[in-house]
Amino acid sequence: MAQSTEDNTRRPRPSDLPEMFRPPVNRAMRVLDRSFFKKTVPLSAATIFKNSDISRVRRALEQSKDILALPRLNTIQDIKQDDVVKKCLLLKETIRHDDTATWSPTINELVDNGVVGVGPFDLTLDYDYWLHSDIISAVLPEELLEEVPQGFTQVGHVAQLNLREQFIPWRHLIAQVLLDKNPTLRTVIRKTEDVGSQSEFRTFPYELLAGDSDMNVIQHEQDCEFRFDFSRVYWNSRLHTEHQRLVDLFKPGEMVCDVMAGVGPFAIPAGKKKIFVWANDLNPHGYEVMQDAVKRNKVFKFVTPFNQDGRSFIRWSARALQKYDPVTVTIQPRTKRTRDASGQVKETQPPLEVYTRPKVFHHYVMNLPGNALEFLDAFIGVYAGCEELFEPHTKEQLPMVHVYCFSGHSENEVDDHIDICKRMSERLEYPITVEDRVGGAGNTELELSIHNVRLVSPNKQMFCASFRLPRAVAFRKK
């Protein structure tokens, strides 16, 4: 089942229910017993004698704040009196049917006028009522309640839990409750080792915690659909805003080289924006998925997948693009329909859109944060002998390079930026410093920016460094 994951990292808010409405506690539970979570709460209710009065009584009691205010609970309930089922409104827990001193003037007036009667009502709450956080808080030891695990990353129907060591004994219980409380989920897994620890394809070993073992997912992002086996490719739903941020930098008709494209989270949306992309990935399954995504999302005129090593692809693609036959894509925009002042429909046919694939790349994307910086030396001499393709001989500038990387997490990020610049300089054999950033006093031709993508862990930050490939690097003769 296809599902959009616009909010991919779900963090249910812990319940702030009053004590009497919280679930029963069993801190010895290790295997989920749903039947244990059942509770009867004695309340009072205002029984409405005529159904025609339900709406006005409800409005009156809402205004007087006498109605029970519990999330996810219908305050209108059935109540049986003398074998006749009537409607009643649940009253807040401080109101007692046998103590008129707890009644508000509104309740007194409704009773005096014979509109309602106030009596006892036993409210039954069960497992289905409470949130994931309510149930988990009722089974974990008290010393762990400050950090109840609630967040997860969703990819299609699969939830990926990242649990700290102290929660491992309850992992299956936590996962089963998560599955029960989220109808779009069918599978819950836990990563047992870091991404890429056992595979060069950035996959990870995992443990199935709850649900079925099917890892073939359907994922939507930026109006594109991807279908893949999550156990065989890399996908991080937390990066959806970063994918969009970068794609928004590309202009229709530009040429992009996506060096480590994965299943295409940059390439496929870019193709939909009429941007030409050569998208490469080393993972054979990722390549197959990307081929499917190209067809499925109808971007085959703009996106071409490849299955090569990233380092060799950087050098090969720059030369191959010059030799390939020109590609021209003609698109007929949809007819525009408008109404004039008299109401008549007027049709306007926009002119044809014509895009010709460029002979040089405008952007390189290197989304392999673990070691993408190590590939930068492939740009040394990448356009050696091809100076005539760029300024001042043509209007084309050298490409922007967008390289993802990890660095330590410093308080003001200055140390991180210095570290990233140092590592880029070493691989490019060209000096890059933090002063070269846009707005700085350094080399303005670099157009350097370092974007903070996300905090991966307390001591690990993900960044995207963007810079224009220096002439001294691109044209260097080895």
Curated annotation (Swiss-Prot):
Record-listed E.C. numbers: 2.1.1.228
Species this protein is from: Emericella nidulans (strain FGSC A4 / ATCC 38163 / CBS 112.46 / NRRL 194 / M139) (Aspergillus nidulans)
Regions of compositional bias (Basic and acidic residues) in chain numbering: 7-16
Positions of the UniProt region annotated as Disordered: 1-22
Keywords assigned: Cytoplasm, Methyltransferase, Mitochondrion, Nucleus, S-adenosyl-L-methionine, Transferase, tRNA processing
Reaction it catalyzes: guanosine(37) in tRNA + S-adenosyl-L-methionine = N(1)-methylguanosine(37) in tRNA + S-adenosyl-L-homocysteine + H(+)
Pfam families: TRM5-TYW2_MTfase (PF02475), TYW2_N_2 (PF25133)
Major subcellular site: mitochondrion
Name of this chain's protein: tRNA (guanine(37)-N(1))-methyltransferase
Family (UniProt): Belongs to the class I-like SAM-binding methyltransferase superfamily. TRM5/TYW2 family.
Summary of subunit composition and partner proteins: Monomer.
Transmembrane segments: none
Binding of S-adenosyl-L-methionine, residues: 243, 281-282, 309-310, 367
GO CC annotation terms, alphabetical: cytoplasm; mitochondrial matrix; nucleus
Keyword Acyltransferase: no
Gene Ontology MF, one: tRNA (guanine(37)-N1)-methyltransferase activity
Coiled coil: none
Superkingdom of the organism of origin: Eukaryota
Localization annotation: Mitochondrion matrix; Nucleus; Cytoplasm
Keyword Nucleotide-binding: no
Annotated disulfide bonds: none
Single GO BP term: mitochondrial tRNA methylation
Role noted for this protein: Specifically methylates the N1 position of guanosine-37 in various cytoplasmic and mitochondrial tRNAs. Methylation is not dependent on the nature of the nucleoside 5' of the target nucleoside. This is the first step in the biosynthesis of wybutosine (yW), a modified base adjacent to the anticodon of tRNAs and required for accurate decoding.
